[in-house]
Design a protein with these regions (language model features):
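Helix-coil boundary and interhelical linker segments in multi-pass alpha-helical membrane proteins
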Residues: 1-15, 84-91
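Transmembrane helix-loop junctions in multi-pass membrane proteins
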Residues: 3-10, 68-80, 145-152
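Histidine-centered catalytic micro-motifs
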Residues: 14-24
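Residue-level recognition of pore/gate-forming positions within transmembrane alpha-helices
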Residues: 19, 63, 100-101
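Interfacial and helix-entry/exit segments of alpha-helical transmembrane bundles
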Residues: 22-94, 121-140
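Cytoplasmic/organellar membrane-interface segments at the starts of transmembrane helices
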Residues: 52-55, 104-163
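Alpha-helical transmembrane segments of multi-pass integral membrane proteins
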Residues: 90-110
Length: 163
């Protein structure tokens, strides 16, 4: 909001939706990762793909989505925000791109060893219940590839009402 016009408002509404779905998926996956590793410290969580592949995949997909990689919905919303910024406030575009780059590097640096790092732990005999993680990620992926017309209409109406 504040970037200018209905397209920016539409992008902001879409971003709030996909970002919150992605973040909740990451929180669910991180909770399972902490239970799997027996610690809440990120430094103590390593090699999730080897120990619990479903937790590892859930965390990795959530991280890729929150980083704004295509085809996830966060990419679509950030793309709309950046294109609106380029049109309405060209000076803000480099700042946004740098901020996205810093966020990308920081998140990737922390998540990569959690998912792919070396571990002494043995694989778990069972997989935790990760339905919420993969449901949210599937919704974010869907919104990156296809927006249901009813949802697009609702966002357009809300964007116009916002200003």
């Amino acid at each position: 909001f504040g970037m200018g016009g209905p397209l920016a408002n539409f992008a902001a509404l879409l971003h709030m939706t996909v970002h919150s779905l992605t973040k909740s998926a990451i929180f669910f996956a991180a909770g399972h990762a902490a239970q799997t590793a027996g610690t809440q410290r990120m430094e103590g969580i390593r090699g999730l793909l080897a120990v619990s592949p479903t937790v590892g995949w859930g965390l990795m997909l959530g991280a890729l989505a929150i980083l704004g990689l295509p085809p996830f919905g966060v990419f679509a919303s950030e793309y709309l925000i950046l294109t609106t910024a380029m049109r309405e406030h060209p000076w803000a575009t480099p700042v946004l791109i740098i901020a996205l780059g810093v966020a990308f590097a920081a998140i990737f640096r922390r998540v990569q060893p959690m998912v792919f790092g070396e571990t002494d732990a043995r694989p778990l005999p069972h997989s935790p219940a990760l339905l919420p993680v993969f449901t949210h990620i599937a919704m974010v992926l869907t919104l990156g590839l296809y927006m249901p017309p009813a949802l697009a209409d609702w966002y357009r109406l809300a964007a116009r009402l916002i200003g």
